Amino acid sequence: MSGVQTAEAEAQAQNQANGNRTRSRSHLDNTMAIRLLPLPVRAQLCAHLDALDVWQQLATAVKLYPDQVEQISSQKQRGRSASNEFLNIWGGQYNHTVQTLFALFKKLKLHNAMRLIKDYVSEDLHKYIPRSVPTISELRAAPDSSAKVNNGPPFPSSSGVSNSNNNRTSTTATEEIPSLESLGNIHISTVQRAAESLLEIDYAELENATDGWSPDNRLGQGGFGDVYRGKWKQLDVAIKVMNYRSPNIDQKMVELQQSYNELKYLNSIRHDNILALYGYSIKGGKPCLVYQLMKGGSLEARLRAHKAQNPLPALTWQQRFSISLGTARGIYFLHTARGTPLIHGDIKPANILLDQCLQPKIGDFGLVREGPKSLDAVVEVNKVFGTKIYLPPEFRNFRQLSTGVDVYSFGIVLLEVFTGRQVTDRVPENETKKNLLDYVKQQWRQNRMELLEKHLAAPMGKELDMCMCAIEAGLHCTALDPQDRPSMNAVLKRFEPFVTD
């Protein structure tokens, strides 16, 4: 007897034995069809399942026919909900009940999905929903699951090495925290498959590399955990330790999925302008990701370095252009290296990291999503993710995801780099009602030289042409209509006359 059938049979036996339940309530719990689920509940359930991207596991578990699987896949490619189509087929054509769906979720260990529909099944089945998060030691002995998570749900966060989400909540060393494999059906073998060519590092080595997680080696602290400087195998590394401080189980799952997302994509794409991931550790006290240490800090920090207590020299015009060029190359690689474009989703100065030679590398891959097959196509997603002030209006307002999202974000970065202003800065006093983009548009028409960073000598000759080319590219990248934005390849072609490497 299958796991689904076993759960149903046990529930039915318990219902028959329970004489205190009313006949009408028992009848509802056992026979309510999936198609009768209230629309808000169904919408929430589909959004959750789509975020986990588990429709293939669901289809496999119930043995849908190949043509039905193809039908679901086709709906997903059109930007529609794959989970909703699964429910249409399995719940509609075959008239399955909510209780059967609950049993299916139990079999695949989709515990949060079980919670979403628990009010529509017998209370006797509620005992199958785990009350607490399993610990690392419990999961190490747990069997593998065929369910997997391909893309974490689109919640905004800063999960890169820069760890720009500065949540100062503390945690103790003995606190029980979930590992990468403990939530969202991410098991050890799933993580290891995603990191096939990546080194799995012994936790004790990382503990030793950081002098026992010494506070002196801590580079930053955020909502997802802490980042430490370490010396491992004679390499200077940055080690991100996952603490998952949120008390909310759903939020813990989001954080875990984003960590898995980062592991999956940083391992599968290698480029000079994409942050190098050296290895991972999931069998010790806390899950860890190990990166190349970027000694130059973030672009955001360098752009504000003149305001620091120990100020650094302002980046030169040529350095600003080189950083912009390298970032553009990294984004172009993400968009074109695979059959399906990868959309970073959170391009901003805080996620552009610099090595000791000021060469840029894009970090924070927790929000990367696979986009539509074509570079100029659009897919509608369930939630907006990323840093909103860097996101285009069609994504913020209508959740329309395309490579144009990254292009727009890069355009804002270009304007920040060459004007020396942050997107959140107030523009000059007589222009207080204008944001950075509106201000640049106005000055571009009236007095272009006023736009340039004031902490540097005014550029001249070819250097001036280079700066104006970059600002103009920033304006084109931030066009309101995504169809008017250039591709990253077109941006690189604009930069070609000024490339010296």
From Swiss-Prot:
Residues 1-25, 144-176 are annotated as: Disordered. Residues 7-18, 149-167 have a biased composition (Low complexity). It comes from the Eukaryota. InterPro entries: CR_Ser/Thr_kinase, DEATH-like_dom_sf, Death_dom, Kinase-like_dom_sf, Pelle_death, Prot_kinase_dom, Protein_kinase_ATP_BS, Ser-Thr/Tyr_kinase_cat_dom. Pfam families: Death, PK_Tyr_Ser-Thr. Keywords: ATP-binding, Cell membrane, Cytoplasm, Kinase, Membrane, Nucleotide-binding, Serine/threonine-protein kinase, Transferase. One of its GO terms (molecular function) is protein serine/threonine kinase activity. SMART domains: DEATH, S_TKc. Changing residue 240 to R: Abolishes activity. One of its GO terms (biological process) is determination of dorsal/ventral asymmetry. PROSITE patterns: DEATH_DOMAIN, PROTEIN_KINASE_ATP, PROTEIN_KINASE_DOM, PROTEIN_KINASE_ST. Residues 55-121 form the Death domain. One of its GO terms (cellular component) is cytoplasm. Plays an essential role in the Tl receptor signaling pathway that establishes embryonic dorsoventral polarity; the signal directs import of dl into ventral and ventrolateral nuclei, thereby establishing dorsoventral polarity. Tub recruits pll to the plasma membrane and protein-protein interaction activates pll. Interacts (via Death domain) with tub (via Death domain). Interacts with Pellino (Pli). Belongs to the protein kinase superfamily. TKL Ser/Thr protein kinase family. Pelle subfamily. This is Serine/threonine-protein kinase pelle.
